[in-house]
Amino acid sequence: MNTFSAKPAEVVHEWFVIDATDKVLGRVASEVALRLRGKHKAIYTPHVDTGDFIVVVNAEKLRVTGTKSIDKKYYRHSGYPGGIFETNFRDMQAKHPGRALQKAVKGMLPKGPLGYAMIKKLKVYAGDTHPHAAQQPKTLDI
């Protein structure tokens, strides 16, 4: 008996929608990362993109526990000397809702071409509407 290896042509990518209202950032991110990789499927193969498309709505209503809304820092750099910028979770959610979730999920995915392809299947929206109704996404409860 040979080891099963999924072929890219035989993988079916489904669409799911997650409502992030009053959900904890890390718990949503870990479930999203698992489904983007395809590890919930029996045909999971590490070198093939077997994951599904995930649409997250109400990302502006995500929360973190404890004092992380002030203590959790996000860093970025302009590329110039002294060009480091720091922001906390509360300010990032106010200015760019959903970016914290995007960064959390990206950190949980593999680095390299396959991981970059996986993160493109994540669609995050601040409000409760999304333009992916034509794909008929299934509701996913976390």
Curated annotation (Swiss-Prot):
GO MF term set: mRNA binding; structural constituent of ribosome
InterPro entries with a match to the protein in the record: Ribosomal_uL13, Ribosomal_uL13_bac-type, Ribosomal_uL13_sf
Keywords, in A-Z order: Ribonucleoprotein, Ribosomal protein
Stored CDD domains: Ribosomal_L13 (cd00392)
One GO biological process term: negative regulation of translation
A Gene Ontology term for the protein's cellular component: cytosolic large ribosomal subunit
Pfam families reported in the protein's UniProt record: Ribosomal_L13
Subunit structure: Part of the 50S ribosomal subunit.
The family this protein is said to belong to: Belongs to the universal ribosomal protein uL13 family.
Its biological purpose: This protein is one of the early assembly proteins of the 50S ribosomal subunit, although it is not seen to bind rRNA by itself. It is important during the early stages of 50S assembly.
Protein name (Swiss-Prot/TrEMBL): Large ribosomal subunit protein uL13
